[in-house]
Amino acid sequence: MLNRVKSLLALTVLATFGFASVATADEIVRTGEGRNFYNNISIPAGAETLYLSGSGASPMEDGSWGDMEQQTVNTFSKFKETLESQGWSMEDIVQVRAFAVAGPYGELDFAGFNSGYQQFFGTDKNPMKPVRSFVQIAGLVVEGWLIEIEIRAARMPK
């Protein structure tokens, strides 16, 4: 009798957790929500993924590069255009890696990055937020860039 109860309990636990896994196996799960990003994003097998190489701002009309916020907005705008041209959206972005350098006065403008970033993520238009890394480095390959960003996107097949 005790073995039968143990077997039934084991089957109940397996069925419960098995069904929970099946319920989330077809969706991207975001957990650990913070103000600007999630701590964890789980992408199930079968999801489509897209990786976009590191990119930075384009020079403005006057030839200058702009400050950190302007460069961040410019770079994410370019990503938005690229994603949309391939049938993806900013909501599909699951990871952002940003590499930044100090500006002309030796200060890293993290607030400027966040200000530009917040125009694209966690908004009414795009409530989604990716996981994110922001790393200060010694230099970037393009003189004048303050930021280089790379992204990864994922979505479930339509």
Language-model features, listed with the residues they occupy:
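N-terminal presequence-like segments and the immediate start of the first folded domain
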Residues: 6-77, 81-158
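N-terminal secretory signal peptides that target proteins for export/translocation
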Residues: 1-4
